[in-house]
C-alpha cells in the first residue's frame, strides 16, 4: 500500500515534536510570574485559538491537551458536555482548546483537526471530540483511523496525507507547544488555565463546577 508507506513517513517526520517536549526545560519562576503567565496565556501565538463561548464571558478556560492522553479523553467525554451546557452555552465561560501533543500520533491527529476545522471552531471541536472517542484505534491503528475520520469530515486519503505533510502547520504547532513549555510552564496534559491560574491534571465536573461557581461569586 504505497499511500500507507508515504503517510507513515509523513507522520514519522513529526518526531521533532516529541524531542522538543523532552529537551526544553521550563523557565524558572520569578516574582510576579503568575500575573505574567495570565497575560501570556490570554493570547494565541502562531495558530488562531479555537474557542467556544462568548468572548466577553467572565471566565476563560484554556486547556492544553493531547489527543492520545486518556485523561484528556475522559474530560472531553465526561466533563466537557456538562461544562458546555451549564457554563459555555449560558455565556459564563469561554473555552479555548490548544494542542499539546505528547507523541507523534497525537501531533498528526492535531494537524488533521486543524485542517478539518479550517478556522471554524464548531467544526474543530466536533472532530476533536471524534478523535478522543476513537483514541484507542487512533493509537493502535493510526493511519486507518485518521483516514476514516478524515473521510467522515469530507477529506479523502490524499487530502489527509497532504495535511500531515504541511510543514507550515507543523512549524506553528511546534512553536505553540514550545511557548507553552517555556513561557507557561506547561509540562503535561491536561493542563488548564482558568482566568490565568494553572491547574494540572484531570478534574471531575464536580471539582470544576465548584471552582467556577466560586469565581462567579467574586
Regions found by a protein language model. Give the residues of each.
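C-terminal cap of thioredoxin/glutaredoxin-like
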Residues: 2-6, 29-35, 40, 64-66, ...
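Extracytoplasmic thiol/disulfide redox context detector
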Residues: 2-3, 9-102, 174-177, 181-182, ...
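Glycine-rich, flexible loop/turn motifs
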Residues: 48, 108, 160
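Structural alpha/beta surface segment adjacent to cysteine/selenocysteine redox centers
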Residues: 67, 73-151
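Residue-level signal for pocket-adjacent positions within structured domains
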Residues: 45-47, 133, 194
Amino acid at each position: 500500500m504505497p499511500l500507507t508507506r508515504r503517510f507513515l513517513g509523513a507522520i514519522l517526520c513529526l518526531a521533532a515534536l516529541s524531542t522538543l517536549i523532552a529537551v526544553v526545560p521550563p523557565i524558572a519562576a520569578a516574582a510576579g510570574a503568575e500575573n505574567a503567565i495570565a497575560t501570556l496565556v490570554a493570547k494565541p501565538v502562531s495558530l488562531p485559538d479555537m474557542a467556544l463561548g462568548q468572548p466577553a464571558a467572565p471566565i476563560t478556560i484554556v486547556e492544553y491537551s493531547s489527543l492520545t492522553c486518556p485523561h484528556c479523553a475522559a474530560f472531553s467525554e465526561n466533563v466537557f458536555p456538562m461544562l458546555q451546557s451549564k457554563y459555555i452555552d449560558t455565556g459564563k465561560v469561554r473555552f479555548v482548546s490548544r494542542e499539546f501533543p505528547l507523541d507523534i500520533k497525537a501531533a498528526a491527529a492535531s494537524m488533521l483537526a486543524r485542517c478539518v476545522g479550517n478556522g471554524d471552531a464548531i467544526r474543530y471541536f466536533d472532530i476533536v471530540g471524534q478523535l478522543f472517542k476513537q483514541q484507542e484505534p487512533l493509537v493502535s491503528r493510526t493511519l486507518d483511523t485518521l483516514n476514516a475520520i478524515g473521510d467522515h469530515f469530507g477529506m479523502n486519503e490524499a487530502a489527509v496525507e497532504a495535511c500531515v505533510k504541511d510543514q507550515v502547520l507543523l512549524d506553528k504547532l511546534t512553536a505553540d507547544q514550545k511557548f507553552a513549555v517555556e513561557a507557561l510552564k506547561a509540562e503535561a496534559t491536561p493542563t488548564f488555565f482558568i482566568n490565568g491560574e494553572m491547574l494540572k491534571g484531570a478534574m471531575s465536573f464536580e471539582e470544576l463546577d465548584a471552582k467556577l461557581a466560586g469565581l462567579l461569586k467574586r
